[in-house]
Design a protein with these regions (language model features):
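Catalytic core of non-heme Fe(II) oxygenases with the double-stranded beta-helix
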Residues: 79-178, 184, 189-204
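Non-heme Fe(II)/2-oxoglutarate
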Residues: 1-74, 79-84, 118
């Protein structure tokens, strides 16, 4: 069963967002993802349930979907737009996946697109394409296609848009980890990077 999405605009004040950012950056471990000679993103991970991070939980917990447990928490600093993927599967994780949660840490001229298409077991969009038996037809509005120039045009013919999330500071978006999703090409819109709190939840 797929979960209903939750979207709340401007849920957290600017002061609260700054507090979250500062608290997380004080306790996080930073790693970089580099491929083909360029850095795609930095990930600032922290242990959500560590006693030292109680102040972070006190801010976030009241707004999380009921019956969820956080199994990964990090600030994502994206330097290149994410392509099509789901978050359903992660190495060593045998729990039942629930939500991906995004909380932007600033205002950005950027959107996350969630598509109606999903996968129960794989993050890789190529796996979905291999099993696809439907008609290849462009069902995405042309104005949206123009924001997805980092994707292969043919891939868009497998997809239809479920919902769109605007990256505004302190907003909250939770959607089922099984759905394929991606960023727009925010570089084309003039943004050099973007940062957000990302949480992955599983069944308790």
């Amino acid at each position: 069963m797929l979960l209903e999405s939750i979207q709340k605009n401007n849920l957290f004040s600017a002061d609260t967002v700054q507090c979250l950012n500062d608290c997380i950056m004080d306790v996080c471990t930073t790693s970089e993802y580099v491929a083909d000679g360029k850095m795609y993103n930095r990930t600032h991970k922290w242990d959500y349930y560590d006693d030292a991070n109680k102040c972070i939980r006190e801010i976030l917990d009241p707004h999380l979907p009921e019956g969820t447990t956080i199994n990964q928490s990090h600030i994502l600093e994206s330097l290149y737009p994410f392509e099509l993927h789901s978050d359903v599967s992660h190495s060593g994780d045998t729990s039942t996946p629930q939500y991906t949660v995004i909380i932007p840490l600033d205002d950005y001229k950027s959107q996350t697109f969630v598509f109606n298409e999903y996968n129960e077991s794989s993050n890789d969009f190529e796996d979905y394409k291999t099993e696809y038996t439907g008609e290849l037809k462009l069902r995405i509005p042309k104005e949206t296609v123009l924001t997805l120039t980092h994707l292969h045009p043919k891939d868009l013919m497998y997809l239809s848009i479920k919902e769109t999330f605007e990256w505004t500071k302190g907003s909250f978006f939770a959607f089922d980890r099984k759905y394929y999703h991606c960023s727009d090409n925010y570089l084309k819109a003039g943004e050099k990077s973007k940062r957000a709190i990302l949480l992955w939840t599983v069944e308790q």
